[in-house]
Amino acid sequence: MAQTGRLAAWLGKGKTFEIREYPVPDPKPGALVIKIALANVCGSDMHYWKGELDMEKRGRTMPINPGHEHMGTVYKLGAGVATDSAGQPLREGDRVIYRYFIPCGRCKACLRRQFKSCPSRQSNWSVTCDVWPHFQGGYGEYFYLGP
C-alpha cells in the first residue's frame, strides 16, 4: 500500500493551491481511508478560491484541503468496520460514496434522518491539512472518513 499521498492544499484568501505530500493515515477503529476516484468543483469552492469567503476569518487554520463532492474506493478499513451504513458488507476495493460531514446520530434531526440539520455535525475539511489525518477534503488522492 502507498506510504504517502498528494493533496491540493489551499493556502488562503488571495493565495493559490499548493500540491503537498503527506503520509497516508492508518484508520482508527471505526474509520476508513478512501482512495479518491472523482472529485467535483462545487460553487462554494469557487467562492473560497475567489476570496469571497475568508476561511481564516471563520476561524480556520490554513492550509486546508477543500472539496466535499467526491467518491472513490475503500483503501483501508479500520478495526470494527465490516458493513456500510446500509448494513451491506464492506471490503477494501469496494466503490463508495459518502458524506463529507459527520452527524452525531443521536439528536432529534439525526433520529429523523435529517442529517444535514444536525447541530453537532462536524466537517473534516474545515481542519488544516497540516495535522493528522491530513486527507480531509476531496482534492487529493485519499480521504479519511472518521468513525
PLM feature segments, named:
Residues A2-A8:
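Short structural boundary motif marking the start of a folded domain
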Residues A9-T16:
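Extracellular beta-rich ligand/substrate-recognition surface
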Residues E21-P23, Y144:
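Generic structural detector for well-ordered beta-strands
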Residues P25-A39, L53-L111:
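Glycine-rich beta-strand-centered segment in the early N-terminal region that forms part
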Residues A37-L38, W49, G146:
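A secondary-structure boundary/capping signal
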Residues S44-K50:
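Cytochrome P450 core scaffold surrounding the K-helix E-X-X-R motif
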Residues H68, D84-S85, C104-P147:
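NAD(P)H dinucleotide-binding glycine-rich loop of Rossmann-like/cofactor-binding domains
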